[in-house]
Amino acid sequence: MSVFCNQIRASSALVRRLKHALFLTQTARSFTTMEGHRPTIVHKRSLDILHDPWFNKGTAFSMTERDRLDLRGLLPPNIMSSDQQIERFMFDLKRLEEQAKDGPSDPNALAKWRILNRLHDRNETMYYKVLIAHIEEYAPIVYTPTVGLVCQNYSGLFRRPRGMYFSAADRGEMMSMVYNWPAEQVDMIVVTDGSRILGLGDLGVQGIGIAIGKLDLYVAAAGINPQRVLPVMIDVGTNNDKLLNDPLYLGLQQDRLDGDEYIAVIDEFMEAVFTRWPHVIVQFEDFQSKWAFKLLQRYRNTYRMFNDDVQGTAGVAIAGLLGAVRAQGRPMIDFPKQKIVVAGAGSAGIGVLNAARKTMARMLGNNEIAFESARSQFWVVDAKGLITEDRDNIDAEAQPFARKVKEANRQGLREGSSLIEVVQQVKPDVLLGLSAVGGLFSKEVLEALKGSTSTRPAIFAMSNPTTNAECTPEDAFSVVGDNIIFASGSPFTDVDLGNGHIGHSNQGNNMYLFPGIGLGTLLSGSRMISDGMLQAAAECLAAYMTEDEVVEGIIYPPISRIRDITKEVAAAVVQEAIEEDLAEGYREMDARELRRLDEEEIKEYVKNNMWTPEYPTLVYKKA
């Protein structure tokens, strides 16, 4: 009888799961992969539809659609499949690559960007189909490192507007001008003020290129619907003399606003976008350090927002640091024993320090003693050298990591000790670069790291773009030795160590986390993005690699797996939002239904809500 009852219970559970799967399929609505199989209502026809990248299919329009949308005679008669269209496009792109393969890399990369951008301008579905299929090859073109070149040259490259521009000249008008954007629903905004683009400094209005590139990855990696993303530039002027004196510069040619005037512009923008789209998520990108933390603290408990430079970079670094512990053959719980020298005390560096300290403290008991013990594991060096309590006018954000004078003296160090001296005396397990100073990890610094007490020291040259990386993998492996872990922010190729072994060059890029953080927040309906959700994302990424991969020195997965990685990270974020009672649900999946999902069902829920680039059937309806 008990066996029979068990069978009945199992059958009931199976029925419940099947019903739930049916529920997910029925309720995922237009944001699911079913979207492309349901008709889409459009309010334009003829040339207007061909000039709209959201709906244009080019030669893939069927004859019935051509008749329905007044397109007959406006296109060549041969109807091509999307695969045939991509084949034609890739032929042109590969021909360019063949012609330019022996030329300088920067012009070649910009030429690829131009070709991809032209496709983006005329046919978004095909653009994202190409990007997803070739993500490992083209992510470095639409995002780092090429996006840095794009931003530097944006005024000359500009052909067609993408996104919105809010400026100091628009004060008092933002609440109305936000309705100029045609999309009724926006799920994701990436906003920058152009003040600190990658490691390139103040690029003013040209910084919008980074917001566009980030959102390309939200679509390609996270499956956010491209019709529901919005890149934004807040132009408050620039302090870049070259741009101020350039007659072709597209932005405001005035000194950058500061203080209360600056805050007033950002406040007005935030109020405007959240008034029109109350559930939008806003990612702050490449704001200078002096404002990055202040704006994060100002808005994070009121709006659904996060700062990728502070929180995203920190999460990716934490995942890599935990992976480095695993690569040493130790459990992740040993992370609090790692001695870490950090080069760079800007927004990214401090963000990583805060996150690493919290992670260590949580492993040690999450009390005051644990936080103090965690603090003692970090030695922070900036442009003036080692930061100690003897430093005058220490930034408030860096203050918690200033070494006590006696601690420094016991280590044979002092206020302002050089990076070489600190590495020599501390003998760290990890050398972490977030300085935006290319080549900072010189041969002398790397030689000093050979004295590390670690069985397998780790070098993180995390600054972007490539020219700002603190060192190359070739430098690291050739100077320190084969038995190291190497990671960088921009892509580098693996190193042939000449003994049948490969020195793996891990790319610790923020794109492993920010798409999943955004998607998980969206699908959970979380009221805010908590530290716990960010921690869950980082730990998910750290655990993604297998033991065999980690032992080989691979601590970050290949970019080719980015859709699967993002699904896992988003599911972890959803789960954490549920556990923290922050989740309010998404569309028909209300908070109560969300709480009923188990781990695998959450992953399925995430997967079903990732947009895929397929042409929908278009049906005209008069507006």
Which residues make up each language-model segment?
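Adenosine-phosphate binding glycine-rich loop
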Residues: 55-56, 305-309, 325-331, 457, ...
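N-terminal mitochondrial targeting presequence
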Residues: 1-40
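Short acidic, glycine/serine/threonine-rich loops at helix termini
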Residues: 177-178, 199-210, 241-248, 292-298, ...
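Glycine-rich phosphate/diphosphate-binding loop of Rossmann-like nucleotide-binding domains
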Residues: 302, 307-430
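Long hydrophobic segments that form regular secondary structure
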Residues: 415-482, 525
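N-terminal ligand-binding/catalytic initiation module
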Residues: 32-304, 576, 603, 608-623
